[in-house]
Amino acid sequence: MQCGITCLQMICKHYGRMHSLETMSRLCPPSREGVSLLGLSEAATILGFHTISARADYRESSEVTLPCILHWNQNHFVVLYKVKKGRKFYVADPGKGLVTYGL
């Protein structure tokens, strides 16, 4: 699963920009371990997005522009698309689909 590329593709789709998986893979070629956060950021910049890489916890979720890509446990990428009162987090996970997490 190319979770990082798929997440970037979801962000593009949200903003009305449709790109094939092949195009995304050319912009951000995966290695055996997948794509890096830096690689995703560079590809997003090429696609016209402004990116910021930062560490945040759930208390800062109201300050984040949504949707955004999260680097989950340093080994997986997901898209956070909704936060409800800082207690429920709605995530699009390329491997699991739409998932809701609560505190």
Task: Locate the predicted segments by residue.
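Conserved active-site-adjacent core of cysteine acyl-enzyme catalytic domains
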Residues: M1-L103
